[in-house]
Amino acid sequence: MADDQFPGWHGTTIIGVKKGGEVVIAGDGQVSLGQTVIKGTARKVRRLSPGGYHVVAGFAGSTADAFTLLERLEAKLEATPGQLARASVELAKDWRTDKYLQKLEAMLIVSDGQDMFVITGAGDVLEPEHDVAAIGSGGNFALAAARAMMDSDKSAEEVARAAMAIAADICVYTNGNLTVEKIAK
């Protein structure tokens, strides 16, 4: 997540990798406030199961804001069962137009095992090119590393873990304590 978008806020890396019939979303565990590590074992990747429809989501940004958005996404998925794209667009529209939601500082990567999207507060619902998406302070490092490995024989999980390890080595706001969730269609 760009520091200029959320001044004074740093920290976290989330990656989504779609390969071999599955999607893996992985996130580091570091929570930073300024130059201080507050926690190293946070879980920023979650499973959602509204109405028995399974989705994995990873978030970067304010935890409280992200949980608010995840709750809204669950409600949208309950209203549009099995339609992650539609639920994501509806969430992004609300996020963009609702005065309360506009103030939320977070980004999401979501997947149902078939589709994967990055959802932003600017109203974007982006389906990543090259089957890799990454957000957060180390997102560009993880994205570049994962894209370099996509043609290898590594599984989606191996690509995600290796890319996160590289990001953690480069980005001071990212650690190697990973939460990894897999989902397949």
UniProtKB/Swiss-Prot annotation:
Binding site for Na(+): A168, C171, T174
Enzyme class: hydrolase
UniProt keyword list: Allosteric enzyme, Cytoplasm, Hydrolase, Metal-binding, Protease, Sodium, Threonine protease
GO biological process, one term: proteolysis involved in protein catabolic process
A single MF term (Gene Ontology): metal ion binding
This enzyme's EC code(s): 3.4.25.2
InterPro entries found in the cross-reference section: ATP-dep_Prtase_HsIV_su (IPR022281), Ntn_hydrolases_N (IPR029055), Proteasome_sua/b (IPR001353), Proteasome_suB-type (IPR023333)
Gene3D superfamilies for this protein: Glutamine Phosphoribosylpyrophosphate, subunit 1, domain 1
Activity-regulation annotation: Allosterically activated by HslU binding.
Annotated Gene Ontology cellular component terms: HslUV protease complex; proteasome core complex
Organism domain of life: Bacteria
UniProt catalytic activity: ATP-dependent cleavage of peptide bonds with broad specificity
Signal peptide: none
HAMAP family: HslV
Subunit (UniProt): A double ring-shaped homohexamer of HslV is capped on each side by a ring-shaped HslU homohexamer. The assembly of the HslU/HslV complex is dependent on binding of ATP.
Cited PANTHER family: ATP-DEPENDENT PROTEASE SUBUNIT HSLV, METALLOPROTEASE TLDD
Function: Protease subunit of a proteasome-like degradation complex believed to be a general protein degrading machinery.
Name under which the protein is recorded: ATP-dependent protease subunit HslV
Species for this entry: Ruegeria pomeroyi (strain ATCC 700808 / DSM 15171 / DSS-3) (Silicibacter pomeroyi)
Gene this chain is encoded by: hslV
